[in-house]
Curated annotation (Swiss-Prot):
One Pfam family in the UniProt entry: GAD
Region (Aspartate): 198-201
Record key words, sorted: Aminoacyl-tRNA synthetase, ATP-binding, Cytoplasm, Ligase, Nucleotide-binding, Protein biosynthesis
Protein name in UniProt: Aspartate--tRNA ligase
UniProt organism field: Xylella fastidiosa (strain M12)
Disulfide bridge map: none
Gene designation: aspS
Length: 589
């Protein structure tokens, strides 16, 4: 049906007859000469039809060409010629194809939007097949394809085995809500779609496969946002007989190689490492964006003698924090803008945002200065490193809450003051706490997941005694403020796994019911093992330069968890419900 791709026609083909197929990108009738931009997945080439040529066939061709609409599907035969008016904006801009035959393969209906427009997201998702024709969307999908291909090549080359794990599996508490599938042959029972292949890949290590990977589809019934979908894709990996450093060194090399191969991006030869505690102290986040040269500074010791109640209450609380953030040249902020910053941090839990301005003259303006002696306040600002022209923001309260809203403020200030450098800053975050205490549930929860091994603790009694301060063997890879991969060394001894379940409030009977197959497998000579999973959607979005992972997923869901193209989810018939033994209950709004 075609001999060449549109976007690959070049000077080497001048004088040759070619057959092309594609879509009408633009058709222009310029007084007897028709120019058609014919587009396929490789690009655009200009097709020319001149009605003035003394040829009956050309007259018919011109009639066809002048009646074309956007996105009509064509087959064109013609001769490649040098183009008189070179177009340097496209790679075929030095040539054109003088048409000898044009066949309309399919007419397109009037379009809801054109391929070169950028309409609202809802209409793009409704007509996703048209949206995906746009050159920018084609570029982003190709980025994703190249990324997956490069990852597979690297892993295949290093002896990893691509092994599929079940999609219909057992419901287990891994954090988010499961998607459940009724089991028709077992009335009242349900499968769950996997949130990750975590347990299966561990069992593959017990089974002796040594190095596993999978481009895995995962499902989590959770609230959506720009970087989260109900169904997503991850590169899942597991290694037997490895330490944390073994895993990190291998995947570091892989990510460096893949970024260079896919996008020409050069990453650091060695990724820096930072403990979770240091990341929270300096940046208020366990996924810090190192491109922003702003850090939080703890000032509890310097504000303890003030009479400002929010500060003194935080200092007195064992879980309190008082942190400062200096923004260079920040005195340009008006009172209205400062109030907007306060409102912004309130979304992240702040109950107030104190500040101090240092005018270029050296004058200090601050609503909290009156709660300090003049020397004490000057000493505080000096400790923070504040200079003339700077503004300093202060956050006080619960440690985690202060970290959250001051981290959000740091990111916003970085954008607003153009402090984000145009480079790539990867790092490893390590030494996560093994557990977090859930005040509401009055029990421990796993910071990573229940299968992560504790660090430097082999004795069960010691783990029980030091659960609140125990560290895990977990690690995250962070790039420009995005967690792109997370992993850990796993628990491989059944008695340690039981002890962790116990600390998490999972009873022996519940552990047996939900994880009995894992506990049994660990009894039969499970090797030490560990692994990591990378978010394909997120990495593809970073490389492609988009803030939304929806742009690199061919058919994403909206933030309302719908597919606008297919109208999923949709009701099903009573007959279908009866077959799967399900009765639905309507809820009143």
């Amino acid at each position: 049906m075609r001999t060449h791709f549109c976007g690959l026609i070049n000077e080497t083909l001048i004088g040759h007859t070619v057959t092309l197929a594609g879509w009408t990108d633009v058709a222009r009738n310029l007084g007897g000469v028709c120019f058609i931009d014919l587009r396929d997945h490789e690009g655009i080439v200009q097709i020319t039809v001149d009605s003035r040529a003394i040829d009956q066939n050309n007259s018919e061709l011109f009639k066809v060409a002048s009646g074309l609409s956007y996105e009509d599907v064509l087959q064109v035969e013609g001769v490649v010629c040098a183009r008189h008016a070179v177009n340097d904006k496209i790679k075929t801009g030095k040539v054109e194809v003088i048409a000898t035959k044009i066949k309309i393969l399919n007419k397109a209906a009037p379009l809801p939007f054109h391929a070169h427009e950028n309409p609202g997201e809802d209409i793009r998702l409704k007509y996703r097949y048209l949206d995906l024709r746009r050159p920018e969307m084609q570029r982003m999908q190709r980025t994703r394809i190249k990324l997956v291909q490069a990852l597979r090549r690297h892993l295949d080359m290093h002896g990893f085995q691509d092994i599929e794990t079940p999609i219909l599996t057992k419901a287990t508490p891994e954090g988010a809500r499961d998607f459940l599938v009724p089991a028709r042959m077992h009335p009242g029972e349900f499968y769950a779609l996997p949130q990750s292949p975590q347990l299966f890949k561990q069992i593959l290590m017990v089974a002796g496969f040594d190095r596993y990977y999978q481009i895995a589809r995962c499902f989590r019934d959770e609230a959506l946002r720009a970087d989260r979908q109900l169904e997503f894709t991850q590169l899942d990996m597991e290694f037997a007989f490895v330490s944390e450093r073994d895993v990190q060194d291998f995947v570091e090399e892989m990510i460096r190689r893949v970024f260079k191969e896919v996008a020409g991006i050069e990453l650091d030869t060695t990724f820096p490492r930072m403990t979770w505690k240091e990341a929270m102290r300096r940046f208020g986040s366990d996924k810090p964006d190192l491109r922003i040269n702003l850090e939080l500074i703890d000032v509890a010791a310097l504000v303890a003698d003030s009479t400002f109640t929010p500060f003194t209450d935080a200092v007195a609380h064992p879980n309190g924090r008082v942190a400062a953030l200096r923004i260079p040249s920040g005195t340009v902020l008006s009172r209205k803008q400062i109030d907007e910053y306060a409102a912004y941090t309130a979304k992240y839990g702040a109950t107030g945002l104190a500040y101090a301005k240092l005018a270029p003259t050296g004058e200090i303006t601050s609503p909290i200065a009156k709660f300090f002696s003049e020397d004490a306040f000057a000493s505080l600002l000096s400790h923070i490193g504040a200079e003339k022209g700077d503004i300093v923001f202060f956050g006080a309260g619960n440690y985690n809450k202060v970290s959250d809203f001051m981290s959000a403020l740091r990111l916003k200030a970085g954008k607003d003051f153009a402090l984000i450098t145009a480079d790539w800053r990867p790092l490893w975050v390590t030494d996560f706490p093994m557990f977090e205490w859930d005040e509401e549930a009055q029990r421990y929860v796993a910071l990573h997941h229940p299968f992560t091994a504790p660090a430097a603790i082999d004795d069960i009694d010691e783990l029980r005694a030091h659960a609140r301060t125990a560290l895990s063997r977990g690690y995250d890879m962070v790039l420009n403020g995005n967690e792109i991969g997370g992993g850990s060394i796993r628990i491989h001894r059944p008695e340690m796994q039981r002890a962790v379940f116990e600390l998490l409030g999972i009873t022996e009977d519940e552990a047996r019911a939900k994880f009995g197959f894992l506990l049994d497998a660990l009894n039969y000579g499970a090797p030490p093992h560990g692994g990591i999973a990378f978010g394909i959607d997120r990495i593809a979005a970073l490389i492609a330069g988009t803030e939304s992972i929806r742009d690199v997923i061919p058919f994403p869901k909206t933030t309302g968890a719908q597919c606008l193209m297919t109208d999923a989810p949709s009701p099903i018939s009573e007959e279908q419900l009866s077959e799967i033994h399900v009765i639905t209950k309507k809820t009143t709004p």
